[in-house]
């Protein structure tokens, strides 16, 4: 099942190609039943160049509401929508009412970026649109950024390029901009400004998209992007857009250290500008909307700002996802929101009339990386401060963000702002015990996979690490297990955790094959366990009364080209401690790995064994199939 997430449908381009025609059919029905126009943007933002995606926007150029997201998700995953005959009644209606639709100027607006698969996906969506009626109105905007399509859709009488040109004109603050070899390169190359220098502008080479560059690369790798040495300007301000130019981050180097000015810093700079420049003769509410991942040092800094008479600041923590921030921001006279990744915007009510210069530097609908870039440079020069002074606004508290595997993410229920767990309550109680004084932590479930994300933040790095380790272990051992009883003994089966790695676990593996425990590097093994993913899972069985790990098994998921990219589960390295044999733990482990393999969508599960173990695996419902061949090196 393909999910419609905060970024729309996004996955490998081959999957998007399969559902593209369905999307066209679904969008026509939305136009007809909602009596509104819609936009369709084909992009995968910061993802690898082989990925692609589709996201929908409403008639105002804003992100669509949840009911439309759920409709799209349900529609593309229902097999019946492949059958054109299902749409015959709708075709007749359209034949009768097509002129009314045109009279109301309803249509679909399609845009796509520079990814190699984008034009084909667009063609298939159009094919789906025209299946309902070959006269249905639509427009295609090739090679546009995501913010550009939002703009032309909601401001069709105005030129986006002219809007950018006007915003760029007053900029005099120097900056080197990494364009991620994405569609933003094409737009940036249209303009000339002696103070802005561009790198990574090869938008006509799709395979270079986001490769060793982009805002996501800089933040996740904490490294300068490729081509950074083209301009040897030490300590100068630099910025990176992402693949579809809807987000930006800033950074500079000093004494060989990379200092990143992310979305927290961008929001703090904008609010500083408002505190110094904005006046009002009537009550005015500014809202700073952020997520739980926003560093508390930034929130504290913003709360310390003083505003002019009649102006009030409200700080509002919203659920993760830019659409959630946007929905909260529009409630204020001025709403400022930015995620740490640099995706954000400033929303102005029409009654704000003394900030025309600043208003023209922000997108009227969504976050725009290019406009946000210009706005930051404009504010720096207007406030007459440099980027080092900007960086000194606050010192972020140490933090750790990690991902934890769980059996069922749906068991985790959070508050609206995602900072508190309603369920499981014992986990929230444990978090509360761990986090005292200036430390905080929260756990939130993923929207798509069976994992939760654990965030811990506080003033001392060592204490943050300790709290993170304790909560992580608690989740692994209590929230991620399946209990069973044999011979009046209770056992639990769960994913392995890095804190399980010790000499006893090595000795357990030594009962399976020869292991030189003295040569094993404990930290290297823990790092290996920490890096496991959903396609490489190690499970352990723990005796609840002694907390000993007494069995282990591995499940590897292989993605194949045959059987329509089918998956195969491989069971490896089954071992039960010699003191605990006779409890059926080996069979329980084998059965559990088989069930997990099925859950992950595998069409079969296979394993290798010696002839002496064939009888055991036959009792586990496995059948002999072929012969194993090996080549050892």
Language-model features: locations:
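Conserved GNAT acetyl-CoA-binding A-motif
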Residues: 597-609
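Catalytic-core signal marking the mid-to-C-terminal active-site face
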Residues: 381-484
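Conserved beta-strand-loop-alpha-helix junction that forms the acyl-donor binding cleft
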Residues: 606-615, 630-633
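Phosphate-binding chemistry for phosphorylated carbohydrates and sugar-nucleotides
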Residues: 6, 10, 14-21, 26, ...
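A short helix-loop-beta-strand connector motif used in the catalytic cores of GNAT acetyltransferases and
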Residues: 529-540, 570
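Conserved beta-strand in the GNAT
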Residues: 540, 548-557, 575
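Short amphipathic alpha-helix that is part of the acyltransferase structural core
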Residues: 485-522
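Conserved acetyl-CoA-binding loop-helix of GNAT-fold acetyltransferases
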Residues: 576, 582-595
